[in-house]
């Protein structure tokens, strides 16, 4: 069937901020779909609250809205843009839930908008667990015994009937949020109570347990003519009971017989028919009992998902692109296979290699959280690796994770960790085999299929052989074929990695590169991407004779290094292409736009290690390598690349080193007359205590060479300092600990700056909303700044100019400043793209990363900026021509933009929600408004923490904050809020004439503060940290990964209860001040105003 002519304009809903369970894969699938719909001749409107996405770049659609993803805002956009259709299958759970709500509230009917890609009826059948079960049973498919309940009593009754353990799955939540496994009544009470709160419809499914069964997924696509294909089978290495997002997965499935696979394929076809999926991609999960072969359908997602992104990257079949075209009426036999250019999308992909995905966790960021893996997803990112065999792919995937070696454990600890899986489980399996355990014993404890365990055990046996045959060429070859890195072999042989590399070179042991082409090399690929293998002879990655630039990606998403760096990578690729270079992308992350088959000219799906990168350089011989766009990952290996005479494009490695080394950096600042906070370094506890004594408390402590403020802290006493120094030594072994004088009550600024070596341009000057001491990645920020004087802005421009020139920046850099008593201090400089580059680009309407990339290959900055000139500048700043001064004018948009962060605290009950110098946010949203108050209010709604305009406020404020907080709370009382406060805060409020209800702290009488929160009487909590209340910190003690130190105070109990009950909370005076302004604005009139992003630039 040809495309539908009855629709012209299509609205696509994005997935919002990156959270656990919904990450960069939706930017990748959304971008792909937008390109497909535009090329088919449709007008496209995109709405997303996340500015760090390629899909919100204006070139991919006819209208971009960066607005909160709520029904109210969507209705306004629909009213304004009048789309004919809504495609909700590309924005994850968020978009599906919104589509259901828009339909049920009659909004789609009101404006004549059709749902395409998935009918309302189908979404409900797939998403509503009770309906899904009924539908499957009618289709003759087996599902697990289960019951939907909406209260605790029914849940207890059901669990008694089914027998423990039982699985609890809240309806309509993401990544298993609020769910879990209950082994007894006490656990059931706890999980069900949380699950009923998390579920938007307040129901949970109690399901019989299939712990230990094998889990499989099929990625399927179907068109309107009934054609059905399986794109890829995926096997979870981990058994049922661990969320598939936290499982190690393998494609294609390795342990299914052909008969079992056909049975599963037939069942998948029946599922699609029964649910009524007429067009698009779906993901269907099955569980198989390894003893009896009994197969049950677990669930299906009627949309593109994390697994479909993985399946697309594993096979080269662009599921999202195909699904978008199917949604507008095309059939599979009308859509070309974009990789071969010869076949059609109706051909099932065939693959002659193995793909392994491993999740990346960061539980150390959430002290107090339960590290055990269960049905609630906890990982923040993932890597994918390709090899000719499972062993090779597994080895490559493990080194892509960029993790440190696991702690050495005794057998007792190993057994415990195998039985209770944690993120380190794979290390423990290898440790078990090293300690002499056999396959059967490990299988009993882990329920992982014996085939995988035998493969892993063989690797450990090879290690023993390596120890016996030092420098044997044949055993070296075998180790390389089995996925061992030069570094691992070097460790076993007790030599340097360089020596192993030389031995390989002397014996001509090199990898060859094979192609991912969807058809096992049956047809020639037009848009090739490659993986390395030592199990092959012919090199399929034959380099062209064009001038090439290689861009190093950022590897797996993690806290501190997320989708923002992929955004800058992709913009870099496009810029180099526009300048006539062939682009080579190297990355290991399957969720991203950078690893899409048509982003760069050539894609290498490889680990970002020195060894893997050097091999690609050997094959491609690029003009140079770009390390400035991928965050800390490429910077970490830059030194070794320079040693091997690889040309680094952009800012030189010498400058990178000066910026990373505190002593060298301080010396440079002194030479050019700039200030930094006084600091010292220490290599022992004694030395640290001495340094802190000289600087005076409070001090800021951090290890060198870390990302996202890992193990950073503000310390007030010598006792706390001692505890922290021990932790820092574990995080960054062999490097000294840095100790800074902490600047209290300073304003922190974040500056994104671009330079071509002569001219310097501040692209974004952002003011942090949170107090100094909160990691800039966790603080909301505003552009343009709201509290800087004209004189101060000019001084900042001069300061940044001096520093950028001294560091010889070519391209982009990020500088963090603090202003205290009108003095400017340099906190740090990063000569690379920062996580704020996408936000700045969207706020000012100028593609910062693209301009920076072009500068790296010799373009002139004023000439590049002239395309966007005149842009809005500060009131009173008049510039007729760019380039008259070496300091180019700083953009000063008329609209205010606020970046707010999203932190996954609800995934980790038990973690304290206080903000500090260690970054914990996974994603961000952007609020745009006529003034700061409107932008801040919209950012809070977008982040899922809408501020209330009526109700009661609970206030408990530390003594140090009372002077500033009391007048702000008085404003809220004047606006009609009822104020409850603990004794000390109440006294301070009463002395200002504020009417307040005194509420006892825990232990001072009932009903107390916690009772008040549990009763649902409070709509906002204001609680600041008192100086005698230590934050909880994760401290490593060798054997056990993390233990929590610090006591659980009343403040901690209030914060965690507010989080559990989904009550908005403010933990700093600064956020209270911003909230008061936002609430006042909201009380004056609606802030549900929507504007096209491009219109906000013209104001």
From Swiss-Prot:
Amino acids binding Mn(2+) 4: 828, 830
Keywords: Amino-acid biosynthesis, Arginine biosynthesis, ATP-binding, Ligase, Magnesium, Manganese, Metal-binding, Nucleotide-binding, Pyrimidine biosynthesis, Repeat
Annotated Mg(2+) 3 binding sites: 816, 828
Pathway listed: Amino-acid biosynthesis; L-arginine biosynthesis; carbamoyl phosphate from bicarbonate: step 1/1; Pyrimidine metabolism; UMP biosynthesis via de novo pathway; (S)-dihydroorotate from bicarbonate: step 1/3
Sequence positions that bind Mg(2+) 4: 828, 830
Annotated region (Allosteric domain), positions in chain: 945-1099
Reactions accelerated catalytically: hydrogencarbonate + L-glutamine + 2 ATP + H2O = carbamoyl phosphate + L-glutamate + 2 ADP + phosphate + 2 H(+)
Free-text function comment from the UniProt entry: Large subunit of the glutamine-dependent carbamoyl phosphate synthetase (CPSase). CPSase catalyzes the formation of carbamoyl phosphate from the ammonia moiety of glutamine, carbonate, and phosphate donated by ATP, constituting the first step of 2 biosynthetic pathways, one leading to arginine and/or urea and the other to pyrimidine nucleotides.
Family indicated by similarity: Belongs to the CarB family.
This protein's name: Carbamoyl phosphate synthase large chain
Organism: Thermotoga sp. (strain RQ2)
């Amino acid at each position: 069937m040809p495309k539908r002519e009855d629709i012209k304009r299509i609205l696509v809903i994005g997935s919002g901020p990156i959270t656990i369970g919904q990450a960069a894969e939706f930017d990748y699938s959304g971008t792909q779909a937008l390109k497909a719909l535009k090329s088919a001749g449709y007008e496209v409107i995109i709405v997303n609250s996340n500015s760090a996405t390629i899909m919100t770049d204006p070139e991919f659609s006819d209208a971009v809205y960066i607005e909160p993803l709520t029904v109210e805002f969507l209705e306004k956009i629909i009213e304004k843009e009048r789309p004919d259709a809504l495609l909700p299958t590309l924005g994850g759970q968020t978009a599906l839930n919104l589509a259901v709500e828009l339909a049920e509230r009659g909004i789609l009917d009101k404006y004549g908008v059709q749902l395409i890609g998935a009918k309302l009826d189908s979404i409900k059948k797939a998403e509503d667990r009770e309906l899904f079960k009924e539908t499957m049973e009618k289709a003759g498919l087996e599902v697990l015994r289960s019951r939907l309940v909406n209260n605790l009593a029914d849940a207890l009754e059901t669990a008694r009937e089914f027998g423990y353990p039982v699985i609890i799955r809240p309806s309509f939540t993401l990544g298993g949020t609020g769910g879990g496994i209950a082994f007894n009544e006490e656990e059931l009470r706890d999980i069900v109570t949380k699950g009923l709160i998390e579920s938007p419809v307040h129901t949970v499914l109690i399901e019989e347990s299939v712990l230990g069964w094998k889990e499989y997924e099929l990625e399927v696509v179907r068109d309107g003519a009934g054609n059905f294909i399986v794109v890829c089978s995926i096997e979870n290495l981990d058994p049922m009971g661990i969320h598939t997002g936290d499982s190690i997965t393998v494609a294609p499935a390795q342990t299914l017989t052909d008969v079992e696979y056909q049975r599963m394929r037939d069942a998948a076809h029946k599922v699609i028919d029964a649910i009524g999926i007429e067009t698009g991609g779906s993901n269907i999960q099955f569980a198989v009992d390894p003893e009896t072969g009994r197969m049950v359908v677990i669930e299906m997602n009627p949309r593109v998902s994390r697994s479909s992104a993985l399946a697309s990257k594993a096979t080269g079949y662009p599921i999202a692109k195909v699904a978008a075209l199917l949604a507008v009426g095309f059939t599979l036999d009308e859509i070309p296979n974009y990789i071969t250019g010869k076949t059609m999308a109706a051909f099932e992909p065939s693959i002659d290699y193995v793909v392994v995905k491993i999740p990346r966790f960061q539980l150390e960021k959430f002290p107090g959280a339960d590290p055990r893996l269960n049905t609630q997803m906890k990982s923040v990112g993932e890597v994918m690796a390709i090899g000719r065999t499972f062993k090779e792919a597994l080895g490559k995937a493990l080194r892509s994770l960029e993790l440190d070696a696991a702690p050495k454990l005794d057998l007792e600890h190993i057994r415990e960790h195998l039985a209770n899986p944690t993120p380190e489980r794979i290390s423990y399996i290898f440790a078990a085999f090293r300690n002499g355990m056999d396959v059967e014993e490990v299988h009993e404890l882990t329920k992982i299929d014996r085939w995988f365990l035998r493969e892993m055990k063989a690797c450990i046996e090879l290690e023993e052989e390596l120890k016996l045959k030092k420098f044997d060429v044949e055993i070296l070859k075998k180790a390389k074929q089995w996925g061992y890195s030069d570094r691992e072999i070097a460790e076993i042989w007790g030599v340097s990695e360089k020596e192993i590399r030389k031995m390989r070179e002397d014996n001509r042991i090199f990898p060859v590169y094979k192609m991912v082409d969807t058809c096992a090399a049956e047809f020639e690929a037009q848009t090739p991407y490659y993986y390395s293998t030592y199990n092959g002879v012919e090199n399929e990655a034959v380099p062209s004779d064009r001038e090439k630039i290689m861009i190093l990606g950022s590897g797996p998403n993690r806290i501190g290094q997320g989708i923002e760096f992929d955004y800058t990578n992709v913009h870099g690729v496009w810029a180099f292409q526009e300048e006539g270079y062939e682009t080579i992308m190297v990355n290991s992350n399957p969720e991203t736009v950078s690893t899409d088959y048509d982003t760069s000219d050539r894609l290498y799906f490889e680990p970002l290690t020195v060894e893997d990168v050097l091999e690609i350089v050997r094959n491609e011989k690029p003009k140079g390598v770009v390390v400035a766009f991928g965050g800390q990952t490429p910077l970490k290996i830059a030194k070794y690349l320079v040693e091997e005479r690889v040309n680094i494009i952009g800012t030189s490695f010498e400058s990178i080193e000066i910026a990373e080394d505190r002593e060298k950096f301080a010396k440079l600042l002194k030479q050019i007359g700039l200030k930094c906070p006084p600091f010292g370094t220490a290599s022992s506890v004694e030395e640290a205590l001495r340094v802190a004594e000289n600087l005076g408390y409070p001090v800021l402590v951090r290890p060198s060479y870390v990302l996202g403020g890992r193990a950073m802290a503000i310390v007030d006493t010598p006792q706390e300092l001692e505890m922290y120094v021990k932790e820092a030594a574990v995080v960054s072994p062999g490097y000294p600990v840095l100790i800074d004088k902490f600047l209290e009550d300073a304003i922190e600024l974040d500056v994104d700056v671009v330079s071509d070596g002569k001219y310097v341009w501040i692209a974004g000057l952002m003011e942090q909303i949170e107090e100094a001491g909160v990691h800039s990645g966790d603080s909301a920020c505003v552009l343009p700044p709201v509290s800087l004087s004209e004189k101060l802005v000019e001084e900042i421009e001069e300061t940044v100019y001096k520093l950028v020139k001294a560091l010889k920046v070519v391209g982009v850099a990020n500088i963090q400043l603090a202003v205290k008593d009108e003095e400017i201090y340099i906190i740090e400089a990063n000569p690379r793209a920062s996580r704020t580059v996408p936000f700045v680009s969207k706020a000012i309407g100028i593609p910062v990363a693209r301009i920076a990339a072009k500068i790296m290959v010799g373009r002139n900055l004023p000439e590049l900026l002239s395309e966007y000139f005149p842009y809005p500048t500060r009131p009173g700043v008049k510039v007729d021509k760019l380039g008259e001064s070496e300091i180019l004018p700083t953009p000063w948009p008329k609209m205010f933009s606020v970046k707010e962060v999203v932190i996954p605290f609800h995934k980790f009950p038990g973690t304290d929600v206080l903000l500090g110098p260690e970054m914990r946010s996974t994603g961000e949203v952007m609020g745009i408004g006529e003034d700061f108050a409107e932008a801040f209010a919209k950012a809070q709604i977008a982040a899922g923490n809408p501020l209330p305009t009526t109700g009661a406020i609970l206030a408990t404020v530390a003594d140090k904050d009372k002077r500033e907080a009391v007048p702000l709370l008085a404003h809220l009382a004047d606006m009609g809020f009822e104020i409850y406060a603990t004794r000390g805060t109440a006294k301070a409020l009463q002395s200002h004439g504020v009417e307040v209800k005194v509420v006892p702290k825990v232990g001072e009488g009932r009903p107390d503060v916690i009772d008040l929160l549990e009763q649902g009487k409070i709509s906002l909590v204001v609680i600041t940290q008192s100086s005698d209340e230590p934050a909880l910190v994760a401290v490593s003690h060798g054997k056990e990964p993390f233990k929590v130190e610090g006591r659980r105070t009343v403040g901690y109990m209030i914060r965690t209860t507010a989080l559990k009950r989904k009550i908005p909370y403010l933990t700093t005076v600064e956020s209270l001040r911003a909230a008061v302004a936002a609430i006042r604005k909201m009380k004056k009139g609606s802030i549900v105003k929507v504007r096209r992003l491009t219109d906000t630039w013209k104001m």
